[in-house]
Amino acid sequence: MQHQCFVSILSASVALGFLASRPDAFAQNRARTELQFPDLPGYVTLKCDLHMHTVFSDGAVWPTVRVEEAWRDGLDAIAITDHVEYQPNHADVSTNYGRSHEIARVAAEPLGIIVIRAAEITRGEPPGHLNALFLKTIDPLNQTNDEAAVKAAADQGAFIFWNHPGWKQPERKSVWYAAQGEFYDQGWLKGLEVVNGGDYDPIAHQWCVDKKLAMLANSDVHNPIGMIYDSSEEGHRPVTLVFATERSEEAIKEALFARRSVLYAGRQLIGEEQFLKPLFDGALHVKNPDVRIKGKSRALVQVVNRTPISFELERLALPDDVNAPRKITLHAGRTSLIELTGKGSAAAGKRTLVLPFQVMNLKTAPDKGLAVELKVNAEFLP
């Protein structure tokens, strides 16, 4: 979004001047923070940011910077989506639509980052802004007619999604335009940006559920990424987790068309239950799945959360034989304790306790958390 770009070439020059005076500024942080999310059965989990800008449209950084930012942030793939119709820096840099991709791809190779050729079709409302990924060439998208521009991308087999639907709407309440309906009916529109920067769009989320559209979360970053986000649990850039058959551009494309994605945004994961459930299950490891309880004694269950996001659980029901906390936080990257207390009425013997919870920050719909079960093998002593 253009409102995010409050600096341009001038600020980039100031930043470069600062870095020139502090040659250690980049070197101090030239390290990658891995985003540890489990693979799903049959798929690898790839971390992607598929909406960002450089000086070749209205961004404030060179394409090589976007690549190293992505590497540092633990990403696997990016798409530089410079505007087709808006090139305010044309007096200073090339107006070749493909140049930012060419530069980024060379820089990405030694870092193992996948760079997808893409562009942002930038129109007024309606139809607004749409990203086209996996383009063969960008020039044909420079059309006066909105539909012709989108069709030019679709004719190349591009994956097309609608960016920040609520951006210019009153109270940011998204409106499904007739133009979007036309693109959808034509089979061109395949996804929606449910999270743009720090903004979550519940209306777009529900549209994805109802219309079977892919969900995406992207930074739409224009300035240096460190000016907007940090590496804390709540401060990271939004990321689209793509479940691909392999680590390749072709596999990412297939996965997006198949809607295999989950969004990592702030302290939330957003997606379909079929992907959130195995992601949650794969994130956890119970250190002591077998416990003993006598009478009203307690047992402490140690649960490791191997992801960078804490899980906020609320109990849905209690099993017959034990009490469990109403709310539990399984802290990111740490081992948390769940205290179970016997009710004193359990018959002696061994059985599996099923503890039903709702994970409040794993959203399958705007107002619906993911239902899960934690299982513990308990031996009740006489």
Regions found by a protein language model. Give the residues of each.
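Charged catalytic cores and adjacent phosphate/nucleic-acid-binding surfaces used
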Residues: 27-49, 127-135, 170-382
